[in-house]
């Protein structure tokens, strides 16, 4: 079989080698390797290429009818032969991304304890808080460079899934590798089990997590601090990604640690970056700048406020003052428009609250303006949904917006798809085909009035793999706001609509390899400019990015004794 790159020296043999997913090649072990590693007779006699293996695996994959069974099958391959898994995934990325991640990963999280087959990553329980250093040493991977960690409290739009939240770090890191070329040998999913408040899980005899309510806030803060300090001791320079933490913890954790360790929150910053990139592409379709648009958010949690903050950063880069940018952003929560007179606002919400004194000319009947009131009075150009509440974008809301704006930009971003604020077909119908639409979950093309409308998916996979690749390639000490902004700009520049290649806002998923490299280059340049990484010339940076980009190809093995 053709093998690529330099030989890899392996101390394992026999069943131990076959049971090591990072090294197992299955039927692709050559005759010489089978003899050298005591594999003769342990495998069928035929020697196969990875292409032949992938063809068989794809045939088996297609035999499963339901998305969750396809997900289980792909995970089984991943736990047996990671190289084959990533070859299969990259060969069929657009088809399999919704299976390995959203929306199917949501079902996998809900069914985690029922479909559990084998362990992957680390599970760190609160009861083991004094053993974190030992647990990290138990990791099967020794050179970890990227960690995705969750506590399972806010899984997609599904709420508290307890230990089932582990499906998210596993799926997210699969995309770091498939889209960003980060070797699976350098990635580690981590589940912090601090209990669950989901009574259904606590009463489920199959539930595999700790059977107690979530711990108190002071205990939680101390536990997270112990974990982060232990991680940076074990793997200095590791990039730590927070994933699906609930609102009371998500933004405080990010603000507490972002200037201390190399970390970012994909729900806040990754979502913000991909959304801003898609907005920039949509604004180009209109021939406008983002700074010329008024934006309404439905949902004022950490994700919505994170997007709003990134929009403000882009608007100020285009020439507005921070105060001018703030006046063009309207946050709506379940009580109505977020205003400075509201009680109980968190710090990040207060920073985006509209001044009551600026709205004296508005007419509304309730204590605070409703979403429909805001649509009438603000006449926004952009409507973004991050509420997790299906159906909030009603026909009246959309039609009102379309009457005031020639080409409204409407992004119902909540996922999974059953929680989307409005379906794209309805948005186009109610706006009479005028809306530019992107969603958080995957939707197919929409036909309206004899015209086909492509529906972009604001999938964070457009952004975070490239950020990770860039951070690793220059060994950046931090992830900065400017790094996120240039990632957005790079995504917008890759828009087919911006390059005269149709109306699609975002490139096809099959083009993510080059996009990730382009984002990595832009991010790496900013890291150097901001003094977060040692300076290197552009050619060296591109060479590092290419060298760091792992490909799912087999290497020839030579045996070594230890």
UniProtKB/Swiss-Prot annotation:
A divalent metal cation binds at residues 243-244, 267. Disulfide bonds: none annotated. GO terms for cellular component: cytosol. The lineage of its organism: Bacteria, Pseudomonadati, Pseudomonadota, Gammaproteobacteria, Alteromonadales. Keywords: Metal-binding, NAD, Oxidoreductase. The active site is at residues 101, 172. Homotetramer. Divalent metal cations. Prefers magnesium or manganese. The record marks 267 as: Important for activity. It catalyses: (S)-malate + NAD(+) = pyruvate + CO2 + NADH; oxaloacetate + H(+) = pyruvate + CO2. This is NAD-dependent malic enzyme. It comes from the Bacteria.
């Amino acid at each position: 079989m053709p093998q690529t790159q330099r030989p890899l020296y392996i101390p394992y043999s026999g069943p131990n080698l076959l049971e090591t997913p990072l090294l197992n090649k299955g039927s692709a072990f050559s005759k010489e390797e089978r003899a050298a590693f005591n594999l003769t007779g342990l495998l069928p006699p035929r020697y196969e290429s990875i292409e032949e293996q992938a063809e068989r695996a794809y045939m088996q994959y297609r035999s499963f009818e339901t998305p969750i069974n396809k997900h289980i099958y792909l995970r089984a391959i991943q736990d047996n032969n990671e190289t084959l898994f990533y070859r299969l995934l990259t060969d069929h990325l657009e088809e399999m991304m919704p299976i390995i991640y959203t929306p199917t990963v949501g079902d996998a999280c809900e069914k985690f304890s029922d479909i559990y087959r084998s362990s992957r990553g680390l599970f760190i329980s609160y009861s083991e808080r004094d053993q974190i250093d030992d647990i990290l040493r138990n990791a099967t991977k020794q050179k970890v460079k990227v960690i995705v960690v969750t506590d399972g409290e806010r899984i997609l739009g599904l709420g508290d899934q307890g230990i089932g939240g582990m499906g998210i770090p596993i799926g997210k890191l699969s995309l770091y590798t498939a889209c960003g070329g980060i070797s699976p040998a350098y990635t580690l999913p981590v589940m912090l089990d601090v209990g669950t408040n989901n009574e259904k899980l606590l009463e489920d005899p199959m539930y595999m997590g700790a059977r107690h309510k979530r711990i108190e806030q002071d205990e939680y803060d101390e536990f997270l601090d112990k974990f982060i300090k232990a991680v940076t001791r074990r793997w200095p320079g590791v990039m730590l990604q927070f994933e699906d933490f609930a609102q009371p913890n998500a933004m405080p954790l990010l603000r507490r640690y972002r200037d201390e360790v190399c970390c970012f929150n994909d729900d806040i910053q990754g979502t913000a970056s991909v959304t801003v990139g898609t907005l920039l592409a949509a604004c180009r379709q209109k021939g406008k700048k983002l700074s010329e648009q008024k934006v309404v958010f439905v949902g004022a949690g950490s994700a919505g406020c994170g997007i709003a903050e990134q929009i403000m950063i882009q608007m100020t880069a285009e020439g507005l003052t921070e105060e001018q940018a703030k006046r063009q952003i309207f946050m709506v929560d379940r009580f109505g428009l977020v205003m400075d007179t509201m009680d109980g606002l968190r710090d990040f919400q207060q920073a985006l609250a509209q001044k009551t004194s600026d709205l004296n000319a508005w007419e509304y009947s309730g204590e605070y303006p409703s979403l429909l009131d805001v649509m009438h009075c603000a006449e926004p150009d952009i409507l973004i949904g991050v509420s997790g509440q299906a159906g909030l974008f009603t026909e009246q809301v959309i039609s009102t917006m379309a009457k005031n704006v020639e080409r409204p930009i409407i992004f119902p971003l909540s996922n999974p798809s059953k929680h989307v604020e409005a379906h794209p077909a309805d948005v186009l119908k109610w706006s009479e085909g005028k809306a530019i639409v992107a969603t958080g979950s995957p939707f197919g093309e929409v036909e309206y009035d004899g015209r086909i409308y492509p529906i972009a998916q604001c999938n964070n996979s457009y952004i975070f793999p490239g950020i990770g690749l860039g951070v690793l390639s220059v060994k950046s000490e931090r992830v900065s706001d400017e790094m996120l902004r240039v990632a957005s700009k790079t995504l917008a520049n890759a828009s087919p609509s911006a390059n005269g290649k149709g109306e699609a806002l975002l490139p096809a998923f099959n083009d993510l390899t080059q996009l990730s490299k382009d984002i990595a280059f832009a991010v790496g340049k900013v890291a150097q400019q901001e003094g977060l990484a040692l300076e290197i010339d552009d050619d060296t940076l591109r060479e590092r990015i290419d060298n760091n980009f792992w490909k799912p190809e087999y290497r020839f093995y030579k045996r070594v004794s230890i």
